[in-house]
């Protein structure tokens, strides 16, 4: 004999069942579309390009055409075939693709810099696995002709110093057109790209080559800053870029003892802040850091690697910003930096992406509501719930 509840379910008209099923499909689809598409627009839409102060030399306001809009992100860590579970890949790569494409569409930057560790297993990749990783990267981080993408090498792309080989470095350079010691100048602003892994200081072939290029570039940049009426003899034959202090872009941060002085909601967690950093592993060595500061006297340094945010002042008041990871796999609240930059000034703003915990909370709440709706529809709720439903129905009828 059928129970009363089952009798109610079986007696529901077919048309009513189909209508209810369509409502459920619409509800589930709406939740999916919101959590996987619209939430990115909702969150990133709140980000704005920061304003730049007046030109230090002329006193005039900078025009939009003279300001370079640059996006900086780091540590995407696309999973590989060894450690990457397919579901983890699907979830994290979809999050980064939607975040990146939404940011490009809403913010329309002139140039985007990715500060290393593009891949998680680049240091181990076979040629076939490397080709697959590159293909996925190019799909996720595709960009319009109005935007330029510049990628800097990290330790997961070519390995730490003891794993780095000429083959791995050239493989990365071929795909991303990256060279340590490369100068990129846009709208009069100079960016210096550094291969942090090659700053070991042990005289290896790759390290010597990278340092020689950096020294030569520092000579050109320093010559460009000389007074036109009092040029030094050694600068007479140098090819001079625009006279603007450079911005240093690299994967490893410059030397600091730890993240103890870092603050903010996306800084390292309290239990990790006081862990001492290891030179040439967590940060550059003191010697390499001093070299870069001495060679270039940068006005700003941007780095990644630690997966957490930090802002420090180096000797001479030179600021360094460590950019958190762009991936949910490494943190719950990823972000990127928006920079409005001129040859003489810059202004930075951090743009947070949707929190993974909030997306999960929406799914849990939607799932719970879905269960309640199904039980209520078939009158399978326990008495207290059913009584509340009857009261609501009577109130609507009145």
UniProtKB/Swiss-Prot annotation:
Keywords in alphabetical order: ER-Golgi transport, GPI-anchor biosynthesis, Hydrolase, Manganese, Membrane, Metal-binding, Transmembrane, Transmembrane helix, Transport
Motif Di-lysine motif per UniProt: ranges: 394-398
Enzyme Commission no: 3.1.-.-
Protein name (database record): Metallophosphoesterase 1
GO process annotations (BP): endoplasmic reticulum to Golgi vesicle-mediated transport; GPI anchor biosynthetic process
Entry's cofactor comment: Binds 2 manganese ions per subunit.
Keyword Hydrolase appears in the UniProt entry: yes
Topology of the protein relative to the lipid bilayer: Multi-pass membrane protein
Subcellular location: Endoplasmic reticulum-Golgi intermediate compartment membrane
Signal peptide feature range: none
Necessary cofactors: Mn(2+)
Biological classification of the source: Eukaryota, Metazoa, Chordata, Craniata, Vertebrata
Matching Gene3D superfamilies: 3.60.21.10
Residue sites binding a divalent metal cation 1 per the record: 117, 155, 251, 305
Transmembrane segments: 25-45, 359-379
Entry's free-text remark on domains: The di-lysine motif (KxKxx) acts as an endoplasmic reticulum retrieval signal.
GO molecular function, one term: manganese ion binding
GO cellular component: endoplasmic reticulum exit site; endoplasmic reticulum-Golgi intermediate compartment membrane; Golgi apparatus
Family of this protein: Belongs to the metallophosphoesterase superfamily. MPPE1 family.
Protein function: Metallophosphoesterase that catalyzes the removal of a side-chain ethanolamine-phosphate (EtNP) from the second mannose of the GPI-anchor protein intermediate. Participates in the glycan remodeling steps of GPI-anchor maturation to allow an efficient transport of GPI-anchor proteins from the endoplasmic reticulum to the Golgi.
Species: Gallus gallus (Chicken)
Residues that bind a divalent metal cation 2: 75, 117, 251, 307
């Amino acid at each position: 004999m059928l129970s009363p509840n089952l009798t109610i379910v079986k007696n529901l008209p077919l048309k009513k069942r189909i209508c209810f099923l369509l409502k459920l499909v619409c509800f589930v689809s709406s939740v999916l579309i919101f959590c996987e598409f619209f939430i990115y627009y909702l969150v990133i839409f709140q980000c704005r390009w920061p304003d730049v102060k007046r030109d230090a030399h002329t006193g005039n306001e900078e025009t939009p055409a003279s300001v370079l809009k640059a996006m900086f992100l780091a540590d995407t860590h696309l999973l590989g075939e060894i450690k990457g579970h397919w579901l983890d890949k699907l979830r994290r790569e979809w999050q980064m693709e939607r975040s990146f494409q939404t940011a490009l569409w809403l913010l329309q930057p002139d140039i985007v810099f990715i500060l290393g560790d593009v891949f998680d297993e680049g240091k181990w990749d076979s040629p076939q696995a490397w080709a697959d990783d590159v293909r996925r990267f190019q799909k996720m981080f595709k960009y319009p002709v109005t935007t330029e993408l510049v990628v800097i090498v990290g330790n997961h792309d070519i390995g730490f110093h003891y794993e780095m080989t000429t083959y791995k470095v050239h493989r990365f350079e071929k795909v991303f057109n990256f060279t340590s010691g490369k100068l990129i100048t846009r709208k009069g602003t100079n960016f210096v790209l550094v291969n942090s892994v090659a700053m070991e200081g042990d005289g290896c072939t790759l390290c010597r080559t990278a340092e020689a290029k950096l020294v030569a570039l520092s000579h050109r940049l320093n010559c460009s800053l000389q007074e036109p009426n009092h040029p030094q003899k050694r600068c007479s034959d140098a090819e001079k870029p625009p006279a603007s202090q450079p911005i240093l872009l690299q994967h490893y941060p410059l030397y600091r003892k730890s993240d103890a002085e870092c603050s903010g909601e996306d800084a390292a967690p309290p239990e990790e802040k006081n862990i001492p950093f290891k030179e040439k592993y967590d940060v550059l060595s003191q010697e390499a850091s001093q070299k870069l500061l001495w060679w270039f006297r940068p006005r700003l340094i941007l780095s990644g690697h630690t997966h957490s945010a930090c802002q420090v002042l180096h000797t001479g008041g030179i600021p360094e910003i460590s950019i958190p990871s762009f991936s949910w796999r490494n943190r719950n609240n990823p972000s990127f930096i928006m920079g409005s930059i001129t040859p003489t000034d810059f202004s930075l703003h951090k743009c947070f992406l949707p929190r993974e915990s909030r997306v999960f909370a929406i799914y849990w709440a939607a799932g719970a509501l879905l269960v309640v709706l199904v039980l209520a529809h078939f009158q399978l709720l326990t008495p207290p719930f059913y009584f509340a439903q009857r009261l609501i129905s009577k109130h609507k009828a009145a």
